[in-house]
From Swiss-Prot:
Role noted for this protein: Catalyzes the decarboxylation of four acetate groups of uroporphyrinogen-III to yield coproporphyrinogen-III.
Pathway: Porphyrin-containing compound metabolism; protoporphyrin-IX biosynthesis; coproporphyrinogen-III from 5-aminolevulinate: step 4/4
BP terms from Gene Ontology: protoporphyrinogen IX biosynthetic process from glutamate
Quaternary structure annotation from Swiss-Prot or TrEMBL: Homodimer.
Keyword tags: Cytoplasm, Decarboxylase, Lyase, Porphyrin biosynthesis
Matches recorded under InterPro entries: UROD/MetE-like_sf (IPR038071), Uroporphyrinogen_deCO2ase_HemE (IPR006361), Uroporphyrinogen_deCOase (IPR000257)
GO cellular component: cytosol
HAMAP family: URO_D
Name of the featured protein: Uroporphyrinogen decarboxylase
Family affiliation: Belongs to the uroporphyrinogen decarboxylase family.
């Protein structure tokens, strides 16, 4: 069954009328309407857990920009919370997780819960957003990768050195594998629940895969992501195929390995040229990306030029979803995002109509 949505078509490398665009963190603090809604919620996790408000912030960039896909508004750290950890977001400090997972016994205490129960607020949001979208564009569900989740759980929050989690990886690999296996089980169950409730594509964010060497990335990150992909429901109850996107920041050198994971789309950061990467793996998977997010600090004219450069580098071939190479930052201009979306739509149409 072929989808009517150009985003889904592009995920499966089918012909499209123009290149689809969505943006990581497209719902966020750079939007004044988001800041107003977050203030109404009280704090970030309260916003994630309020069905009406989570739906509202998901829809805000769709109404403003006419993007080609919506992405569920939530946070990757809902999984550690569901497994028994206390997760809070301290102002100016980022996430704090307590108690941190430091030894084998800590890992054994983590509980595998049914996301239909422990993360029921996410499922309500998925269903609510699907209704609000009214089938006009598809909804992307998401999760953090097992490795990225493990970094927060072992470090107890964000880290610059990743000393604790890497120490476990090197000194106690059996403990790290147990943690990653538990997380892979939970991530797969979580994404399958999102699919049951209406997610039409899913993305796994491996934000911290790039801090690993290539051998350790294969063993400790990619292996666990593949375990998740292998367990995902790739067709929903309506008979629609569900594309799977893997985005591993800082891992463009590993694209061949990632393309063999079973995913449909490989997300790229901005550090490599998309044209040569398409030549290497574009016959296997679609590619998502990969404009430097910092271009949004430039003038609208330079932003449009940057968008054209990415689109022209990929060319008129099937299988490209335009995105940034990482998420939106809070201090980016909504007007500059509008200039980007407009440029991608105009140039993406020309490329696929053969007039670029």
């Amino acid at each position: 069954m072929k989808s009517k949505h150009r985003f889904i078509q592009a995920c499966f490398r089918q012909p499209v009328d123009r290149t689809p665009i969505w943006l990581m963190r497209q719902a966020g603090r750079y939007l004044p309407e988001y800041r107003k809604t977050r203030a109404q919620a009280g704090d970030f996790m309260a916003l994630c857990k309020n069905t009406e408000l989570a739906t509202e912030v998901t829809m805000q960039p769709i109404r403003r920009y006419g993007l080609d896909a919506a992405i569920l508004f939530s946070d990757i750290l809902v999984i550690p919370e569901a497994m028994g950890m206390d997760v809070r977001f301290a102002t100016g400090e980022g996430p704090l997780l307590d108690p941190p997972v430091r030894v084998h016994g800590d890992i054994e205490k983590l509980i595998h819960t049914d996301p239909e129960d422990s993360l029921d607020y996410v499922m309500r949001a998925v269903a609510s957003i699907r209704k609000a979208l009214n089938e006009e564009i598809p909804l992307i569900g998401f999760s953090g990768s097992p490795w990225t989740l493990a970094t927060y759980m072992v470090e107890g929050g964000s880290s610059k050195t990743f000393g604790l989690v890497k120490g476990m990886l090197y000194d106690a690999p059996e403990s790290m594998h147990l943690l990653l296996d538990k997380l892979a089980d939970m991530v797969a169950a979580y994404l399958n629940a999102q699919i049951r409730h209406g997610a039409q594509a899913v993305q796994i964010f491996d934000t911290w895969g790039g801090v690993l060497s290539q051998p350790t990335f294969r063993e400790f990150s990619l292996r666990s992501m593949k375990a998740v992909v292998d367990r995902l429901d790739r067709t929903n109850s309506a008979g629609e195929r569900i594309p799977v996107i893997l985005f591993a920041k800082g891992c463009n050198a590993m694209v061949e390995d990632i393309a063999q994971s079973g995913c449909d789309v490989v997300g790229l950061d901005w550090t490599s040229e998309i044209g040569p990467l398409r030549e290497r793996i574009g016959h296997k998977v679609a590619l998502q990306g990969n404009m430097d997010p910092a271009l949004l600090y430039a003038s609208p004219e330079r932003i449009a030029q940057g968008a054209r450069e990415v689109l022209q580098a990929f060319g008129p071939h099937p299988g490209h979803i335009f995105n940034l190479g990482h998420g939106m930052a809070p201090d980016m201009s909504p007007d500059h995002v509008e200039a980007l979306v407009r440029a991608v739509k105009e140039e993406g149409l020309k490329i696929h109509q053969g007039v670029a």
